[in-house]
Amino acid sequence: MKEIRQFTSESVSEGHPDKVADQISDVILDAILAQDRRARVACETLVKTGMVLVAGEITTQAHIDYEQIIRETITEIGYNHSEIGFDGATCAVVNAIGKQSSDIAQGVDRELEEDQGAGDQGMMFGYASDETDVLMPAPITYAHRLVQRQAEIRRNGELPWLRPDAKSQVTLLYEDDVPVAIDAIVLSTQHSPEISQATLREAVIETIIKPVLPADWFAHCRSENIHVNPTGNFIIGGPMGDCGLTGRKIIVDTYGGMARHGGGAFSGKDPSKVDRSAAYAGRYVAKNLVAAGLAERCEVQISYAIGVAEPTSVSVNTFGTGRIAESRLVELIQAHFDLRPVGLLQMLDLIRPIYRKTAAYGHFGREEPEFTWEQTDKAEALRDAAGLGPATAEIINVRSERH
């Protein structure tokens, strides 16, 4: 008898107040890294009606016009008029940025680059699953694609009443851990006052939802389980509706709850912070193990001590789907991936201004050039080292059928 279960993940758009904050923090990081590769950045942002506050610790030789960068980012997101409730041209900008503590710096900055220590203690998780073509869990993948589609339709003017703030949620049905159908959808989008709820619902379903979701999965979803703006009007949104903070959407940023999370946020942190770089490396490791056919699902945990270069632990969980022992997978990881802080930077080419794009629609499952941690360039070597030989036609065919 098949085991049936549900799993739900959510995402939010670039205009959600927490994501506005994340993008501002990462735009500042990018601007600094473009001038100073050795900068240390920990930038936090708060947005609320009529104001932006940036704070944190930044040590750099770069010369940055913080106010201009912040205003441009808000305007690009779509908050460009007081009628929307937030305007990048007129909001107040408060700067409370200081410098990195010398106590932290002495553990991170070393004479020899290879001795660079971790910027903090902590544990980070990476995850991959063969249930989608990007080796990500299906619920978060389609939750992201819904709000990405909302932004695309808003920007191209196809539905001119759309506004920047939006949220999505997708519930999938699984049979024996394989996704087979969509059971429920929530899509809430900010809108201008003149649109009726009936018109909005029909347009959102036809223009945003149906083009994104697999038709065979969507066919199983009952109409009463498609929730479009279920509370009615969503006119007041963005920072006017809610206070936004950097780092408050860490599950949206990662695996939608399908994998564990070490607790550290990403945005606004330069890659010397293992909260960010080791989480990216964890995804890189897990994705390559799954791409190599060594497991169908894989979760990798890496941990560090502040000021220490080598990880304090590396562990793997394949949830019973591994082709070889998990202890052997750990050996392969240690042989094929340099998980020291300097190794993370070099392996994934992280000291670049690439982070604005990561700050909305997820840090993983994005196969664009900036997302080096999504490459599967080590899969063949891992498979050979495991003694499994080249990928079979059977494996290739199964993967080609993923949604």
From Swiss-Prot:
Subcellular location: Cytoplasm
Residues the record lists as binding K(+): E44
Transmembrane segments: none
GO biological process, one term: one-carbon metabolic process
Binding residues annotated for L-methionine, in chain numbering: E57, Q100, D242, K273
Major localization class: cytoplasm
Binding site for ATP: H16, D165, A166, K167, D242, R248, K249, A265, K269
Chain residue ranges for the region called Flexible loop: 100-110
Cofactor note: Binds 2 divalent ions per subunit. Binds 1 potassium ion per subunit.
Record Pfam families: S-AdoMet_synt_C, S-AdoMet_synt_M, S-AdoMet_synt_N
NCBIfam families according to UniProt: metK (TIGR01034)
The protein's assembly and partners: Homotetramer; dimer of dimers.
Protein name from the UniProt record: S-adenosylmethionine synthase
Species for this entry: Nitrosococcus oceani (strain ATCC 19707 / BCRC 17464 / JCM 30415 / NCIMB 11848 / C-107)
Gene for this chain: metK
